[in-house]
């Protein structure tokens, strides 16, 4: 941290998991060659002692990142209903990258297991009383004050939080690639928090069966059946993490 700034790092959990971790948590384990490891360095650019890096192998660290680094951060987990996450993968990545439920990597992306595995590791590896924080996208949309509460908890200035903004001008969007236009269409056209993206947007709990029927019309029976199976499999992990989410 320098000049009063706090570094913020955002990444999908599965992208930092060890291949071994992924293989062990898939219904059908996959072979892997080795576990890559990112080595921590001192401020002078020298590698830390081997004994310190060996801790990564002995403490159950499920990621390729050094335990020393993970213990220096405040972990924040953002969760959302699996039905909304997994369908969005097809809706957004399908047209832009050809994503399909039968892709080899889809079972890895369409899972909340990596969040749960990493949450549990952080919870057991608490240092100086720092506990992992869980934010539910639904709660953030319905109760924006949760973000202000988070800022206070992290000792950040809550007045810097924005709930409204100007849409991206069409002139800028026109200069973007088709991928960017499609992938960022929602956020770029918005002017604030979109409550219609809430899982209970109509004031009712998410009706998964009704949503499945809609999917059938868009993606067909076979793809929908596979998509629904991923959602059902992820629900226990989602409900587990919901138990720890930050609330007002």
Regions found by a protein language model. Give the residues of each.
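PAPS-dependent sulfotransferase catalytic domain
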Residues: 13-161, 181
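Generic structural motif recognizing short loop/turn segments at the entrances and edges of beta-strands
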Residues: 4-5, 130-131, 191
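Small/polar (Gly/Ser/Thr/Ala-rich) solvent-exposed segments
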Residues: 1-15
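PAPS-dependent sulfotransferases, especially Golgi type II membrane carbohydrate sulfotransferases
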Residues: 157-248
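Hydrophobic, Leu/Ile/Phe/Ala-enriched alpha-helical segments that form helix-helix packing faces
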Residues: 1, 89, 119-126, 154, ...
């Amino acid at each position: 941290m320098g000049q009063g700034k706090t570094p913020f790092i955002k990444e999908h959990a599965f992208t930092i998991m060890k291949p071994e971790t992924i293989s062990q948590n898939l219904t059908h384990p996959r072979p892997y060659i080795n576990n890559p490891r990112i080595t921590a360095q001192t401020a002078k650019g020298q590698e830390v002692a081997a004994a310190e890096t060996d801790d990564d192998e002995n403490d159950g660290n499920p990621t390729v990142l050094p335990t020393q680094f993970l213990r220096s951060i405040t972990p924040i987990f953002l969760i959302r209903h699996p039905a909304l996450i997994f369908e969005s993968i097809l809706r957004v990545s399908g047209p832009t990258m050809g994503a399909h439920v039968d892709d080899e990597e889809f079972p890895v992306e369409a899972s909340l297991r990596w969040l749960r595995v990493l949450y549990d590791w952080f919870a057991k590896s608490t240092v100086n009383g720092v506990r992992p924080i869980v934010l539910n996208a639904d709660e953030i949309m319905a109760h924006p004050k949760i973000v202000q509460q988070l800022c206070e908890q992290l000792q950040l200035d809550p007045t810097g939080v924005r709930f409204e903004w100007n849409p991206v001008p069409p002139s800028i969007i026109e200069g973007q690639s088709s991928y960017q236009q499609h992938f960022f269409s929602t956020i770029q056209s918005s002017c604030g928090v979109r409550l219609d993206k809430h899982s209970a947007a109509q004031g009712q709990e998410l009706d998964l069966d009704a949503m499945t029927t809609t999917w059938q019309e868009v993606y067909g029976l076979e793809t929908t059946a596979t998509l629904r199976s991923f959602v059902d499999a992820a629900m226990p992990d989602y409900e587990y993490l919901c138990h720890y989410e930050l609330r007002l």
